[in-house]
Amino acid sequence: MKSALCNRFFILLPWILIVIIMLDVDPRRPAPQLTSRPYFSPHTVGCGGSRVPLRRSSPGRDAAEKRNESRPQLQPEPRLPTIYAITPTYSRPVQKAELTRLANTFRQVAQLHWILVEDRATRSELVSSFLARAGLPNTHLHVPTPRRYKRPWLPRATEQRNAGLAWLRQRHQHQSAQPGVLFFADDDNTYSLELFQEMRTTRKVSVWPVGLVGGRRYERPLVKNGKVVGWYTGWREDRPFAIDMAGFAVSLQVILSNPKAVFKRRGSQPGMQESDFLKQITTVDELEPKANNCTKVLVWHTRTEKVNLANEPKYHMDTVNIEV
């Protein structure tokens, strides 16, 4: 009896399963899409059961994000104050050599603009070609020194320095002045790169020692408690500013705020050009000592030796005209 019931049950079981499956199928539900990619939900469960979008990742992007997370976020660097170097120059056998040495130094200084002023009525081909190849931001000016001022005992380069000052003021006349520093870079000086780092932080007028000047190994401002209190110099200690032209820098804002400050011809005694200029824009108490409280020499008034051209032929010249 039991055997007969079991046989009937097993015969009916497949039909019962078929009926259950047919009842469970909803003909209105679309069939699932077949895909070669593994299926995953585009959301993940967040706090409180909320569904949060799940971002897909790629190996390249994950690696870049890891690098960015480990790298500190750098703030944009403030713009360096521009250093304006005014260089008077005049024609002579060593002119190109002097300018080459100076350009090799300036080329290593960031954010420097070279204002080269020739002592002549027109621009020379030598200086124009030189500046075109110098690889430096530059301005080429020219102004001749009046004949009556070309005396050995009179100050030189007065008109040229004033031309550089006039160009700066005109350039910034109708625009807000960017941070900048001005200094007078004669072409017969030698400069340490450290000097440019020192002068770039000038707030008003900064000063430092100068080597090989005034008949001494160096001249310098005397400093006490961070203030200039006197001058170590070999000539006229009574000068208001007993300093060489290579021994100071001036903020661009000070130059623009004092439009009448220039180098004077009339009423200026020999050797007093620096003092007469600085008196118009500052006082000794306001000077900012640089170069470790004026105890380091970072600029030298080297002066190229006067060349001996006694053997230069007057006749039977070389057939090739070489620029020197």
Curated annotation (Swiss-Prot):
One of its GO terms (biological process) is chondroitin sulfate proteoglycan biosynthetic process. It is an enzyme of class 2 (transferase). The keyword rRNA processing does not apply. The keyword Transferase applies. It is a single-pass type II membrane protein. The chain crosses the membrane at residues 3-23. Expressed in the cerebral cortex, cerebellum and whole brain. This is Galactosylgalactosylxylosylprotein 3-beta-glucuronosyltransferase 2. Keywords: Glycoprotein, Golgi apparatus, Manganese, Membrane, Metal-binding, Signal-anchor, Transferase, Transmembrane, Transmembrane helix.
